[in-house]
């Protein structure tokens, strides 16, 4: 009996050791309830609705699809991937360099505030509730402003979370946050917003698979109208959002 019990315990221990890395932290971090203040930002959608660029479900899907594939979605994912790799091996110099680049790439004051406020809030919340060996040391390398994608990549890398699902979760959360903003701006309803998320999900998957092959030299954006919209939003007469 003792032998059988011992064998069972050994088998149980082996099963736990062989289990895949839990992705539960991603499910917790990249949800609307995580305290980063994402609800306060629309990433130029508020201006796009005012200007008539976003009028309905179809135009919203097109606008967000462009932001994802040609704009900040792609660039942020590249930055998150490089922060993930640097954090995973404890390369503080590389982390600081990626973060400085990410902050500098923000095309306007409002979008810089958006990424830096969320980045610092995200990092503070993870450190407070999800400690891990090396997390505080990695965070200490980022003095002052912290870009949101860098904060996400850092936390996931330190926690040993795989890069591909981290990128998928990060990009999908980005889409969901922007769709939520669009619903509050009222050009679409909740059901239409859900369809937009489903429409963009394959693009999220494809981009998450592509990003690990890209370098910092591949950073770039072709969403000029959205970038200009972030400037115009600063003086927009009626505003619900900070960007």
From Swiss-Prot:
Localization: Cytoplasm
One GO molecular function term of this record is:
nickel cation binding
Taxonomy, superkingdom = Bacteria
Q: Is the keyword Ribonucleoprotein in the record?
A: no
- Record InterPro entries: UreF (IPR002639), UreF_sf (IPR038277)
Which keywords does this Swiss-Prot/TrEMBL entry list? Answer: Chaperone, Cytoplasm, Nickel insertion
Q: Which Pfam families match?
A: UreF
GO CC, any one term: cytoplasm
Where would you say this protein principally sits, based on its record?
A: cytoplasm
Q: What PANTHER family does the database record attribute to this sequence?
A: UREASE ACCESSORY PROTEIN F (PTHR33620:SF1)
What this protein is reported to do is described as: Required for maturation of urease via the functional incorporation of the urease nickel metallocenter.
Q: Which family does it belong to?
A: Belongs to the UreF family.
Assembly information from the UniProt record: UreD, UreF and UreG form a complex that acts as a GTP-hydrolysis-dependent molecular chaperone, activating the urease apoprotein by helping to assemble the nickel containing metallocenter of UreC. The UreE protein probably delivers the nickel.
Give the protein's recorded name: Urease accessory protein UreF
Quote the gene name from the UniProt entry. ureF
């Amino acid at each position: 009996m003792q032998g059988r019990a011992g064998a069972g315990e050994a088998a149980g221990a082996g099963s736990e050791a062989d289990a895949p890395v839990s992705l539960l932290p991603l499910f917790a971090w990249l949800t609307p309830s995580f305290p980063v203040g994402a609800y306060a930002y629309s990433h130029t959608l508020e201006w796009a609705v005012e200007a008539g660029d976003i009028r309905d479900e179809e135009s919203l899907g097109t606008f967000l699809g462009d932001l994802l594939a040609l704009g900040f979605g792609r660039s942020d994912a590249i930055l998150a991937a490089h922060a993930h790799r640097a954090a995973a091996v404890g390369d503080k110099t590389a982390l600081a360099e990626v973060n400085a680049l990410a902050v500098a790439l923000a095309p306007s004051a409002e979008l810089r505030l958006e990424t830096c406020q969320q980045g610092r809030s995200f990092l503070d919340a993870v450190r407070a509730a999800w400690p891990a060996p090396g997390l505080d040391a990695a965070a200490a390398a980022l003095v002052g402003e912290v870009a949101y994608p860098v904060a996400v990549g850092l936390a996931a890398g330190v926690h040993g979370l795989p890069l591909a699902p981290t990128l998928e979760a990060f990009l999908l959360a980005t889409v969901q946050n922007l769709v939520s903003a669009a619903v509050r701006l009222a050009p679409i309803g909740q059901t239409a917003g859900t369809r937009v998320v489903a429409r963009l999900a394959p693009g999220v998957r494809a981009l998450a698979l592509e990003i690990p092959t890209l370098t910092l030299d591949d950073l770039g954006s072709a969403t000029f109208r959205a970038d200009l919209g972030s400037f115009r939003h600063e003086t927009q007469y009626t505003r619900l959002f900070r960007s």
